[in-house]
Regions:
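Amphipathic alpha-helical assembly segments used for oligomerization, scaffolding, or translocation
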Residues: 32-106, 125-129
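Long amphipathic alpha-helical scaffold segments
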Residues: 107, 111-148
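Second-shell loop/turn segments in exported
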Residues: 92-93, 114-115, 144-147, 215, ...
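N-terminal secretory signal peptides that target proteins for export/translocation
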Residues: 1-7
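Exported/periplasmic cell-wall-interacting domains
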Residues: 17-21, 58, 62-75, 79-84, ...
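N-terminal export leaders
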Residues: 10-14
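Hydrophobic alpha-helical membrane-insertion segments, chiefly the h-region
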Residues: 21-32
Length: 305
């Protein structure tokens, strides 16, 4: 025989509502709710990694076809991009840009694949290297200082960027090996025009030089290193290798007059100046050659000319 249905009393309903309400308010329930929300929000965060991987693989297919699966051509393409990416990563590290860590790690991960003889692997390495090298440069231009001067010692080249746009691109001559231009992140500290360079070394010293007038100079250290014109040096002698030649400086950076004139008018005091090896080696190797302290003060002693 069926038992009669018993309806809950108002007191019972009230207790049930209170219990349910307490259950929904306890930390565990909220944690589950937050966890579900986090999972739904996490999907878009993972998507860029998958998208990047797909983009790299698609580019690898195109590169393999473009170079007709020639391993030498793929390797040359990858090595050029790897050098450029490492140099940009070095500048970013000197400027203490935290975003460079992930991109540089990915760049080196693909770079480690270049020892393979398999063309598919080489194509993937080339594509990955180019992808992250491009990202490094774009990020440096977009989130780096609005005004930035970089000097590559290997290329003997100065590049000045104004909000990511190249303003000056000029061949230079830096310090001779015995008085090499300092490496690291420095800044414009003073500007003078005209100026007469005076030797900090006594007459009779192998480093002595006579008083030398220049049209203008932008100092980037407190020990005598600056960017200036050099009327005694033909422009044709500027560029790669000139730091080992007869016109090599005592630590300063020689520039064509037109280039230094533009910089003098454009660069305010405080403009960052990054001098880096620029030899395409791993960023960690290049950063280890820094010769300035954390404040950008050179540790190398007096310089000049």
């Amino acid at each position: 025989m069926a038992r009669p249905v018993t309806r809950p009393s108002r007191r019972t309903l009230l207790i049930a509502v209170v219990v349910v309400g307490i259950g929904l308010s306890v930390p565990g329930a909220n944690a589950v709710a937050r966890s579900d929300a986090s999972l739904s929000n996490a999907t878009p965060e993972r998507a860029p990694g998958a998208a990047e991987d797909a983009a790299v693989r698609a580019e690898a297919t195109q590169l393999r076809a473009r170079y007709h699966a020639d391993p030498a051509a793929l390797l040359a393409s990858a090595q050029a991009a790897l050098s450029a990416g490492r140099n940009d990563a070095t500048i970013a590290f000197f400027l203490k840009r935290g975003w460079a860590d992930r991109m540089n790690a990915a760049l080196e991960r693909y770079g480690a694949m270049l020892g393979s003889a398999d063309t598919q692997t080489l194509a993937l390495a080339d594509a990955g290297i180019q992808h992250y090298a491009t990202q490094l440069h774009a990020s440096l231009m977009q989130s780096g200082p609005a005004r930035l001067i970089t000097i590559s010692l290997r290329a003997q080249r100065l590049t000045a960027y104004d909000r990511g746009r190249v303003l000056v691109d000029a061949l230079v001559t830096t310090g001779r090996p015995a008085l090499a231009t300092d490496v690291g992140a420095m800044r414009i500290t003073r500007k003078d025009s005209p100026w007469t360079m005076q030797s900090p070394w006594p007459k009779g010293s192998p480093e002595w030089y006579p008083d030398t007038p220049v049209r203008m100079v932008l100092w980037f250290t407190e020990n005598g290193e600056g960017l200036h014109d050099a009327s005694w040096q033909p422009d044709a002698t500027l560029g790669p290798g000139s730091q080992n030649g007869p016109y090599a400086s005592h630590g300063c950076v020689h520039l064509p007059l037109a280039a230094v004139t533009t910089l003098f008018q454009w660069a305010p005091i405080g403009t960052p100046v990054v001098v880096y090896p620029g030899d395409g080696s791993a960023a960690a190797t290049q950063v280890a050659q820094q010769t300035v302290d954390a404040a950008g003060n050179p540790l190398s002693g007096v310089r000049g000319d």
